[in-house]
């Protein structure tokens, strides 16, 4: 079943290759969507794909890349049209 989740990741998540690493992991898992920095220092990600793959990526977001220090990941289910790829915005 295809699911779509919007995530807000807080902590030391900008300037640590978080977006590029998220894209790499998403592509590895077959998840589509996007990831971007927010002005308040958080990272926002939209994840769409098979529920199992999206859950795996959500779990990975709690760790992130080596230099990241994630303190919180908030997520909510959203409904949007199908996305074809994963991009860094």
Swiss-Prot record:
Active site: 19, 37
Keywords: Hydrolase
Catalytic reaction equation(s): an acyl phosphate + H2O = a carboxylate + phosphate + H(+)
Sequence similarity: Belongs to the acylphosphatase family.
Name of this protein: Acylphosphatase
Domain Acylphosphatase-like: 4-89
Transmembrane segments: none
MF-aspect GO terms: acylphosphatase activity
EC annotation from Swiss-Prot or TrEMBL: 3.6.1.7
Enzyme class: hydrolase
Signal peptide per UniProt: none
Pfam families attached to this UniProt entry: Acylphosphatase
